[in-house]
Amino acid sequence: MPGNPWPHDMVITVDDDSQAVLDLLWVREAWELEPVGDDLPPRLAHGPARVSETVRADASADPVSWQQAWPGLWQATLAHAARPHDPCVFEALGRTDDGSPERRELLGRLIGPRAREDFGEPAFADPAYLEWTHARFQEHMLRRPLNAEDQPERRSLDALIRAWRAGLEKVVAIPCVGTFTRMLGPHTLLVTGETRRDPARYAEALAWFAESR
């Protein structure tokens, strides 16, 4: 379109609502886990209520092992988020049988690691999980820009274009406090929602990506 500053061939994917990421962040805070590891994310901007004592008393709940597994699962989840989309996986799924090992393997590649599988349903049994998920959805909808020009990528377009020319294809935003800007491989940038909503901070993060490449 004439006069549109967005390059016609620039495609940027923004993932600011990854259920795998949200589930991990919720479990960490609702269960008051204190995982130890390098480069773990900051706390949620709007944290959940603490899991009730009734749910904690469930014999199948194992927060000690969840705490130990959390850092590795976090890194695996980010690695999957940075992986480029492979349309061949969808095609291959259609040629597999329900319940077959091949189908499970392909689904794992498509969906990636999930806290529900690693921690089990007891980790999400508290009603606080649904309450927080609903509140998060409401907040996410309220924050949606009313027009394209108010989108964070549009408000930091110059920096975004430079980052795209340096290889950026995807931005992953997590609903955590403060600044947590990381490169997830050669084509993906991780930022907090706070950073993405602030044009100056977002431009700085995008510039850092471009300079690092």
Language-model region placement:
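N-terminal low-structure segments adjacent to metalloprotease catalytic domains
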Residues: 1-133
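Auxiliary, metal-adjacent structural segments of Zn-dependent hydrolase domains
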Residues: 124-189, 194
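Generic alpha-helix signal with a bias toward terminal, lower-confidence helices
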Residues: 26, 33-38, 43, 82, ...
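Generic hydrophobic, helix-prone segments enriched in Leu/Val/Ile
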Residues: 25-28, 74, 107, 168-171, ...
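Active-site recognition of the HExxH zinc-binding catalytic motif
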Residues: 191-213
